[in-house]
Amino acid sequence: MNQIPCLIRTSTAGGEAGYALGDPLVDSYLAFVAGRCRPNTLRAVAHDLKTFFTIIDKAPVEVVAADIFAFVADQRGDRSVVRISDGESGLSARTIARRLSSISGFYAYLVARGDTPVASSPVPCGLSTRRRGGRRTQVPLVRVPRTLPKILSPAEVTALLGALRTDRDRAMVYAMVLGGLRRCEVLGLRLGDVQVPERSLFIAEGKGGHQRVV
């Protein structure tokens, strides 16, 4: 790109927040994504693409598979980031995999358009390997470990509730602990969403834009 891309906040025709990086192809993709996903997802994709093109410093049509491997290596060895889980430097495998997904989605969009010089995605699907029986399979570029969710013990929940000083804070934590609400869902609750007679909560803005009652 010859210069560090700058992420600019824009607005769509419908007044919704959008993003632009100053490259026509990237901006076209971000506008496409803006109409198909939630604001948090759009923000993550925009930042992922900004990070990628800042590090690679190439125009989208010039990127090759070697650049993808170089980007993965850079993210794994980023000394400006220290993981809390193990104290090692570099981003987590989950974060790197998400960024690769954003990059892959961008190039899949360019290929699907058919009116750009990009005929195929430079993002490898994975590394080919052979298992027993001669069956080939694909090993992902970044392995994301499967981990069990971390939950609070009853004693920890009791200690947490005991440390809260207001009824509002206790109600928010109870909604998450007993109702399984996500943080963003609790923050999005309005007084009218609390149905006291039915002892239920109406979630208007759940994950993926889905609504539900708990």
Write out the residue ranges for each language-model feature.
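N-terminal core-binding DNA-recognition domain of tyrosine recombinases/integrases
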Residues: 27-43, 49-142
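Conserved tyrosine-mediated DNA breakage-rejoining catalytic core shared by Y-recombinases
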Residues: 184, 188-214
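Aromatic/pi-system hotspot detector in well-structured domains
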Residues: 12, 16-17, 23-30, 52, ...
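N-terminal alpha-helical segment
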Residues: 25-26, 68, 77, 153, ...
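DNA breakage-rejoining catalytic core of tyrosine-based enzymes
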Residues: 130-159, 208-214
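Basic, Lys/Arg- and aromatic-enriched nucleic-acid-binding interface segment
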Residues: 150, 154-183, 187, 207-211
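Short, low-complexity cationic-aromatic patches
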Residues: 18-22, 92, 96-100, 179
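N-terminal DNA-binding module of tyrosine recombinases/phage integrases
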Residues: 1-36, 148
